Amino acid sequence: MSINMRTLTQALAKTAAVIEKTVQTTVQEVTGPKPLQDYELLDQIGSGGPGLAWKLYSAKARDSTRPQQYPTVCVWVLDKRALSEARARAGLSKAAEDAFLDLIRADSGKLVRLRHPGVVHVVQALDENKNAMAMVTEPLFASVANALGNVENVDNVPKDLKSMEMSLLEVKHGLLQIAETLNFLHNNAHLIHRAVSPENVFITSAGSWKLAGFGFAISQAQDGNLDNLQSFHYSEYDVEDSILPLQPSLNYTAPELVRSKTSSAGVSSDIFSFGCLTYHLVARKPLFDCHNNVKMYMNTLNYLTNETFSSIPSDLVSDLQRMLSMNESYRPTALDFTGSSFFRSDTRLRALRFLDHMLERDNMQKSEFLKALSDMWKDFDSRVLRYKVLPPLCAELRNLVMQPVILPMVLTIAESQDKNDFELTTLPALVPVLSTATGDTLLLLIKRAELIINKTNAEHLVSHVLPLLLRAYNDNDVRIQEEVLKRSTSVAKQLDGQVVRQAILPRVHGLALKTTVAAVRVNALLCLAELVQTLDKLAVTEILQTIQRCTAVDRSAPTLMCTLAIANAILKQYGVEFTSEHVLPLIIPLLTAQQLNVQQFAKYILFVKDILRKIEEKRGVTVNDSGVPEVKPGCVADGLQFQTPTKKTEKVASAAKNSPAWDEDWALPTKISAPRDPGPANSPQFNNSTVQSQSSNRTSVPTTCPAVDLEWPPRQSFNATAQPANDETRINAAGTPTTPSFDELDPFANWPPRPNSASTASGGFHNSTTTQPPINNSGSGLRNNLTDGRQFQTTNNDFWAFGNASLSSMKSQQETSGIRASNADPLTSFGIQNQNQGMPSFGSSSYGNQKPQADISSIFSSSRTEQSAMKLAPPPSIAVGRGRGRGRSGTSISKPNGSKQQQTEQPSLLDLL
């Protein structure tokens, strides 16, 4: 049996077609119509069409590789299942549903064929399956019905739509565009729309008003053919048929279409509907609100009075009354309406009209218009600026001749936009300008760079703004270099640190070093000062190298002050140590620059002094005018912290008060300055116990760090000159009394005239500092007095056994230690002399001007030698043992006590000698 190949091929082709159709149907049932397959829905933006049955969604193409006419589009979706359920609830027949769907199909078919700027542009034609219908158009904002507050069939009302308020200027501009579209339909397309209403007028994302909803449209050739003319049937009672509207809304329908027996339906029917729409938009309320009740409609129409038009502008009333006339012949044409004084007398509207057709004008006309617009645009509201003014200006930026004129206005208007708005509408138009700008255009963009920086994200900043700045760095125009340096910091704050170091910082260094213009160098140095806070130490070191090279050839005052600004920024960012090590070596030589005036030099010297002061505070050491260092209590000096051990001194003070022979107010200095009569035999035992108690206290009281011996001269030099002191030191280590130099520690050693007792007590307190922590830099020997004061009682009897040889050795020791002490602290003896000068009561006592005073002092040592030795101030007025060093407040208390004690003890001293 032979096989007919032709028949087999045909059979296979039919089978393949059936399979393909089945597959397509199955895919559509699963994924929906083709527009839903090709585009990804984003958000619902509104609703529109007959009965607001269409849901409008913003969408973008799923295949981003294919070129698209619009970045975003509007997808119209009609849910058949929801429509069928609503029809069943309303009790309507299936035939009514099918008739409505046929109306939708006719609308989309005519919309595809019509090409006009005033008609909604279809991107992808209608496609449907058994569950839904969908088509794709240019991006839309919403329908006019939504803008007027009717948001039926909108699940979530967008924020922009909810807060939308159309100004009269925007309404005028939109009505003028619809009038031009009707003129095109009537005179060019020869169509009668018959359903001009807010549901069928749409606002695009660019702000233009466009016409749709051609389901009821007929050609003018069908006007006189009653057989082909579709008749509308409106009831004489209220009917809500908005679910499946099979005729236009009665509120916007001409009376000749409402009558049951109509002779004709011409273009004047659209003018009547357009008049109703105009009234609604201007008066903010509909002219007819009859709920499809024809009787109410006719009553309202027959009794239109002047009161009805009270809310209409006077220059529109006459034209609007003609448009709403029941007599068709009285109604103006669409073209006539565009010539109304309502439109012609508004200068702002004329400016918007010029912008609509700006691409058709020559450069001379554009220049003249833009000059007038520069003073006029401030009167526009934000919506008009965003949707009416900015889009045509951005489109005109492609004209290189007009860029310097248009760009300032575009950037000024962009200031009123939020960040999202700017990135969606303005930035795409600016990107070509940013990549090609030169000369004055580049200068303008650099001056307004902060606006672009603040309204773009980091990705756009790196891809579009940063290349613009780099071209400005390399430009030879000094003005551009200055401006880009001023804007560098704001860009650097939003960029990654590595990008700043690799792209911006080297170019700023280059401008600072290579330029011959002082203004450019100053701005470059100021830029470096502002960038310090974002840089690491390595980059800051490079900045210091640039400063050194700049100041080597340019020591003008502006350059030097910019250098100081960088130094201050480094000090603030990295502190004193880094600044003193790296910045001060550069700053100090600049102090000798003659270009600095008085105020500028003062700022320089204050900067240096401030650093030195902070270093002193950190070390805890201050140096007075005489060069004497002073260590503050509780501060760190040479890595050690000082803390006054108050517990030990308080115990010594309590022990002193237990002795009946000591003065209760100020015991220790009094006992040291004058020898007392030989005490009872138990005095040595009392002092030994006191010393032992002090030794135990020293080991028990904790300190913050090991003690530092601050006594001067050092012990080894003293021991080398006085062997008895060495012997005494060894005894002190065993817990017995010692006899150190008195001149080094006695606060009253240099008071003139010096009594004999001052020299006799010169062996008391030297080596006690071997285990005692210091107090401060001005009274290091005071605690030695307090600690070893009790030892004097056990040593004064043995002291006289040394004889004249011992006194001679002590005298030489006193001279040596005094000279060394005066070299270490020349202010010490000066302070004691001031205190002595302020104490006349002691000098005028029984030793004041008496001859025996000179004889007594000659026994021990010369008063001149004693005056030259290092002296310490008397202890403070507080309790004994506080260890607060030299203080003048203590002298007022010591004066009467010391004077009184020496007066009472002078006879016993003379008897002893």
Curated annotation (Swiss-Prot):
Biased composition (Polar residues): 682-703, 716-726, 756-791, 811-820, 830-868, 889-907
UniProt cross-references to PROSITE patterns, sorted A to Z: PROTEIN_KINASE_DOM
GO molecular function, one term: protein kinase activity
Repeat region (HEAT), residues: 311-346, 347-382, 383-401, 402-439, 465-502, 499-537, 578-617
Positions of the UniProt region annotated as Disordered: 651-791, 811-913
Tissue specificity statement from the Swiss-Prot or TrEMBL entry: Expressed in roots, seedlings, leaves, stems, flowers, and, at low levels, in siliques.
Gene3D superfamilies: Leucine-rich Repeat Variant, Phosphorylase Kinase, domain 1, Transferase(Phosphotransferase) domain 1
UniProt keyword Repeat present: yes
CDD domains linked to this entry: PK_SCY1_like
Domain Protein kinase span(s) in chain numbering: 39-343
Keyword terms of this UniProt record: Golgi apparatus, Membrane, Repeat
InterPro entries the record matches: ARM-like, ARM-type_fold, CIK-Related_Protein, Kinase-like_dom_sf, Prot_kinase_dom
Keyword set includes Kinase: no
Subcellular localization(s) per the UniProt record: Golgi apparatus membrane; Golgi apparatus, trans-Golgi network membrane; Prevacuolar compartment membrane
An example Gene Ontology CC term for this record: trans-Golgi network membrane
Knocked-out gene: effects: The double mutant scyl2a scyl2b has short root hairs and small shoots.
Protein purpose: Probably inactive kinase. Component of the AP2-containing clathrin coat that regulates clathrin-dependent trafficking at plasma membrane, TGN and endosomal system. Together with SCYL2B, required for cell growth, plant growth and development.
Domain free text: The protein kinase domain is predicted to be catalytically inactive.
Family under the similarity heading: Belongs to the protein kinase superfamily.
Protein name: SCY1-like protein 2 A
Organism: Arabidopsis thaliana (Mouse-ear cress)
Gene: SCYL2A
